[in-house]
Each structure stands twice: as C-alpha cells, then as structure tokens.
Amino acid sequence: MTLLLELAHGLPWLYFSLVFLFSLMIGSFLNVVIHRLPIMLEREWQAEYRSYFSSDTPQPEDDERYNLMVPRSCCPRCNHPITALENIPLLSWLWLKGRCRGCQAAISARYPLVELLTALLSVVVAMTLTPGWGTLAALLLTWVLVALTFIDLDKMLLPDQLTLPLLWGGLLFNLLGGYVPLGDAVIGAMAGYLVLWSLYWAFKLLTGKEGMGYGDFKLLAALGAWLGWQALPIVLLLSSLVGAIFGIGLILLRNHHQSKPIPFGPYLAIAGWIALLWGDSITRWYLSTIL
C-alpha cells in the first residue's frame, strides 16, 4: 500500500495508467461473468427442476462442464476457439475490426464497451479517492456494479451470487474500519431492503402489478451495507432521477414500449456509484441550497 501511495504522488500518470490497464483485464473477465453467470443459473434451475420431477421427465445426459473458466471461449457461430492474441482487452476487437477471425461474423461492440467502461470508471475512482484500502474496496464495488448492471439489462435479473456477497462484503469492510461505522452499515442494509420491499408491496396492492424484483431490494441493501443508512436517501433520489431520464429518453426515441418493464438495478448501481464518490458533497450542496 505504501508503494501505491508513493506511485500515486510521485508518478500519478503511471499510477492511473496501471489502474486503467489492470481494469481493462477486469472488464474482460466481467464480460465472461455477464454472459455465463445467467446461463449457469439457468442450467442449475433446470437441474433442480429435473430432480424434483425425475419420475415424470426423462433425464438428459449433460456431462459438459460449464462455469466461468470452462469451456474455452469460442465464436457462437463457427465455434472458432478464441486465442490469447484474440482476447486482448479492447485491442483485439479493434485489430479484428469487430469480426470473428474464423467466420468473419460480427462481434458485439458491447464487449469492448464493458472493458472500456470498467477501465474509465476505475480511473475515476483512483483519481477521486486517496490510494489505500478504501480505494481498492471502491474498485471492487465498482466492478461488481458493472456486472450487475449489464446482467440486469440483459436478463432482468440481479443474481444472489453477486448481490449477497456484495452485501456481506460491505458489512465486513466496515467491520474492519471502512467507510462508515458498523452500526450504520447494518442499519443501512436493513433499511435498504425494507424501503424497497415496502414500496414493492404498496405498489402491488394498489395496482396488482410488480414494480420491481427482489434483487433490487438486495442491491439497495448491499449499497446500504457499504455506504451506511445516511447514503440511502441520495441513492434513492439519484436512481429515480436517472431512471426517469433514461425512461423518458427511450419513450421519446420510440425505442421502448410502455408495457415492457425497465430494469431498476442499473439505476441503483449508477446512483450507488455516484454516492460512493460524491455522496457527501452532493448532500452538503443540497443542504446548503435549501437552508
């Protein structure tokens, strides 16, 4: 940690460059998580279903291992295995001009976008916070929020496999003297869950519809565990504001049907990340404005 401090103060350009390059690699791994984790969960649910109804349905043979490490990544169209040279974050996509080397099928621009976004957000964290354990924790939180955002956008799902470790990680970090006292973190986790849970049931009783999912409750609880209960109002306010802006924009662009649900997780993630870095400044500005 002392080396990081010396590097940040003596050679800030090198420090930020290392953060950028390392986070590009993290972004590449996040692409794997975003793509594979929902598939892994679906396979697990299907296996559980078959185990419950084994006497009624035939058991398919599926010996293929599938997790974050295996099988090796390949083109979904021609099964061309992706080599190490073709898997360099950001650069490989540019070098291949966004096409598979085997069949020339287009490779989604989402892959380099996730890598670049992860790297840029990480550099902002490094530039905003003083190098230390708090910065490393903020980077970890940022990376998990990126993965949750894109999974929710794709599948309308916030997996427990990410939200629950994030919640317990926030409590553990604050137990060790992190951002807020442990008591504030515990209250933040409880209040974060209960606030959205209450809104969910109030909305359902009034309209008969579900306004959000339980994953949203757990994500706000996790943010409360990291940032404390004091950050919850600003997180809720910012997430509602960001959600309104994106929702209105999609409707105006006619790129979204009003009956189609919009995931709330990405807006919570964006608001939580903003509150992590600038929550105190926003609160002070707001209070000084109205008082």
Swiss-Prot record:
Its cofactor is Zn(2+). Zn(2+) binds at C75, C78, C100, C103. Its main location: membrane. It comes from the Bacteria. The chain crosses the membrane at residues 14-34, 107-127, 131-151, 162-182, 186-206, 232-252, 262-282. GO terms for molecular function: aspartic-type endopeptidase activity; metal ion binding; methyltransferase activity. Zinc is required for the N-terminal methylation of the mature pilin, but not for signal peptide cleavage. InterPro entries: Peptidase_A24A_bac, Prepilin_IV_endopep_pep, Prepilin_pept_A24_N, Prepilin_peptidase/N-MTase. Keywords: Cell inner membrane, Cell membrane, Hydrolase, Membrane, Metal-binding, Methyltransferase, Multifunctional enzyme, Protease, S-adenosyl-L-methionine, Transferase, Transmembrane, Transmembrane helix, Zinc. Its EC number is 3.4.23.43, 2.1.1.-. GO terms for cellular component: plasma membrane. It catalyses: Typically cleaves a -Gly-|-Phe- bond to release an N-terminal, basic peptide of 5-8 residues from type IV prepilin, and then N-methylates the new N-terminal amino group, the methyl donor being S-adenosyl-L-methionine. It is a multi-pass membrane protein. The keyword Secreted does not apply. It is found in: Cell inner membrane. Pfam families: A24_N_bact (PF06750), Peptidase_A24 (PF01478). Belongs to the peptidase A24 family. PANTHER family: PREPILIN LEADER PEPTIDASE_N-METHYLTRANSFERASE-RELATED, TYPE 4 PREPILIN-LIKE PROTEINS LEADER PEPTIDE-PROCESSING ENZYME. Plays an essential role in type IV pili and type II pseudopili formation by proteolytically removing the leader sequence from substrate proteins and subsequently monomethylating the alpha-amino group of the newly exposed N-terminal phenylalanine. This is Prepilin leader peptidase/N-methyltransferase. The lineage of its organism: Bacteria, Pseudomonadati, Pseudomonadota, Gammaproteobacteria, Aeromonadales. The gene is tapD.
